[in-house]
Amino acid sequence: MELQLSETQALIRDTARKFAREVVAPRARATDREERVPADLYAQMGELGLLGVNLPLELGGAAAGAVSYALAMAEISAACASTSVGMAVTNMCGELINAFGTDAQRKTYVTRLATGEAVAGAFE
């Protein structure tokens, strides 16, 4: 059985890999030491579409599916586990609000999560 990534999956993987290697990895030690993922990393992940991989296009997501999400998570996780947890929680919250929230909640929160304007988490 031969499995190949779709063009979208390969693009998301490659985008996440480049970002992880060039931006996330060099800051991983400081991120862990400070016990906080820098806000600008979330903003950059949002710009790249990494915070809404499974969210609908109309809400700022990529609508790219679970395989694309797993590929992106693997790349970010390899560079910095802390950053990947923040990415995972933000994606998860966006997906839950999209699935179970009202239209008003979707418009208010999901778009902000997908773009990195807002970040999900309360781990203080």
Predicted regions and their residues:
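A non-catalytic, amphipathic alpha-helix used as a structural packing/dimerization or gating element
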Residues: L11-E22
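Intrinsic disorder at enzyme termini
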Residues: M1-T8, I12
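Glycine-rich flavin
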Residues: A25-E124
